Amino acid sequence: MMEATASRTVTIVNPQGLHARPADMFVKLANRFSSTVSVRKGHETVDGKSILSILTLGAEEGTQLEITATGQDADAALAALCELVDQGFELNEPSEANNSPWL
């Protein structure tokens, strides 16, 4: 049986680019899936589950990256990772002020 492959090009929208914190968020999310994940910038392709590899891309605001996932959960992995990038890496940071029981 062939493994599913899904890919999409995304643009880094956060002003600080893909520095340590968002790279860590990306890698942690990628590692929740069994699919392999790769990220391509220009002619360079790196392991999307390795923070050091992601950081070597030096992706700044406006950089286009192609994310590819291959495996049983490729579509779900790609959707989650693209949403994270599209939202400027803010998905895992809900405002605690909005959850206050005192409001």
Language-model region placement:
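N-terminal loops that bind phosphate or other acidic moieties
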Residues: E3-R8, I12, I51, E96-L103
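Long, contiguous binding/interaction regions
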Residues: K28, A79-A80, P101-W102
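Detector for Asparagine
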Residues: N14, N31, N92, N98-N99
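Compact, glycine-rich, soluble single-domain proteins
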Residues: T11-E61
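C-terminal structural segments of small proteins and small subunits
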Residues: E61-Q64, T68-N98
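Signature of N-terminal electron-transfer/Fe-S-associated modules in redox systems
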Residues: E3, A20, F33, A79-A80, ...
